[in-house]
Structure formats: C-alpha cells, structure tokens
Regions:
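A structural boundary/capping signal
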Residues: 1-222
Length: 222
C-alpha cells in the first residue's frame, strides 16, 4: 500500500491548466474555451437532493456507516439506470456540447463525458475525497482488432487498495460488480492512452499527449 496515496496520485502526472472547447455560450454556435475543472460540481444543493431522494433514499450522509467503495458502486448503478446515451450531434445539433451535471440529470441523457462528469460530481457531493475522483479523456479499444475511439469516463481510486478503477456508464459498464471486484484500470486493455484527466481542483496531462479533436461518441454497450 502507498504511504501517502493522496500526495502520490495528485503528483503522478503533471498538473496544468487545460482549456477545452466544450460547448458554446447561449445564442452562439461556435464553441468557446472552458476550464475543464468547472464542469465538475463538488458542492451542489440539487445534486445532494438527488442523492438524498433517489440514490440513498433518505440518507443525508451517505458515508455514515458505509464505505466509499459501496457509495461509488451505488452511484455508478444509479447513473447507468438513469441515463440514456445520446450523442451530441443528435441531442444538441453540434459536434461537441459538454453538459453540466444538473443539465444531464434533468435531460436524463447525454454523451459519454456527460455521464462521467455526473458520476464524478455525485461522488464528491456524497463525501468522497476529491483525490479519489477524476474524469479521464482518452482512447478506448473495444477489442484488439477494433479501431481506437475517443471516450470520457469517471475513474475512482478505491479504498480497497488505493488503486484506480473505472466507473463507466456507457462503455463496457460493470455496475453489477462490487468496486473491490472491478479490474484495475492499469490492467485493462479496453482503456488505452489517456489524454488528460481532471476533477474540480486539478487537471493533469498524461503521457505527453497533445489533445486534439474532441471526445468522440461511444455507442452504449449492450
């Protein structure tokens, strides 16, 4: 086990400001730059109400008497059941449109990164430590012979061993598995190189990748 996992994981990759043309402003078509950290809402009354009323059924403090791993599994399962995958071009009429988490909840649909951002935001509002939560954007490869595609997904550093697992909702999702039984992210072949990752505090660049293009649509795994 790591001596200081929070310090280790926060320093594992270079921290830097990352701007992304995630969405246009109202009344415009052209997307504008956003600080990607601003898409994750860590302390929001609406999200806390959703957790209280619909995820943890009247429990105002989900972490009371429950492990973070169990909370994470319940949140992943809720998002998988609640959201329908709809690509940005079909839903918004534009190539890329990142939603804020309450928008995703109200619409009950979104692209891959929308659900990932909502999962991350729910985790933080439930009381999970920020260093255990991040959204990653990078390549995925469904099979050895399949082409790579861009994808956004939520990662969680589980309490079991302070290692990262994926809490996906629309690509190879495994919400039926306990977090302690999920395969480690570093051992998965279906998740490839990461371009960048972020939570509401920090953004990290990975593997010297220069981000290009967009987080592409991924079809819902059935």
């Amino acid at each position: 086990m790591l001596q200081d996992p929070e310090a280790y994981w926060n320093a594992k990759h270079p921290q830097q400001d990352i701007l992304y043309e995630g969405r246009p402003v109202p009344g415009r078509i052209k997307r504008v730059d956003w600080d990607i950290r601003r898409f994750i809402w860590h302390d929001d009354a609406i999200l806390k109400t959703v957790l209280y009323q619909h995820v943890f059924l009247g429990t105002s403090n989900p972490m009371l008497g429950r492990s973070g791993d169990l909370v994470a599994r319940d949140i992943q399962e809720f998002v998988v059941d609640h959201l329908k995958y709809v690509g940005d071009e079909k839903a918004q009429g534009v190539e890329e449109f990142w939603l804020f988490p309450t928008e995703t909840y109200i619409l009950k649909q979104g692209d891959c990164e929308d659900g990932a951002i909502m999962i991350a935001s729910f985790l933080l509002n439930a009381g999970i430590a920020p260093w255990r939560v991040r959204v990653s954007a990078g390549w995925v490869k469904p099979s050895p012979t399949a082409p790579q595609g861009g994808h956004g997904y939520c990662c969680y550093c589980r309490e079991t061993d302070n290692q990262w697992v994926v809490l996906d909702w629309c690509y190879n999702q495994d919400s039926h598995k306990d977090v302690s039984e999920k395969p480690l992210l570093k051992e998965r072949d279906d998740y490839a190189d990461v371009w960048f990752s972020f939570n509401h505090l920090y953004a990290w660049s990975h593997s010297g990748f220069a981000m290009a293009g967009r987080v592409k649509e991924k079809e819902t795994d059935t």
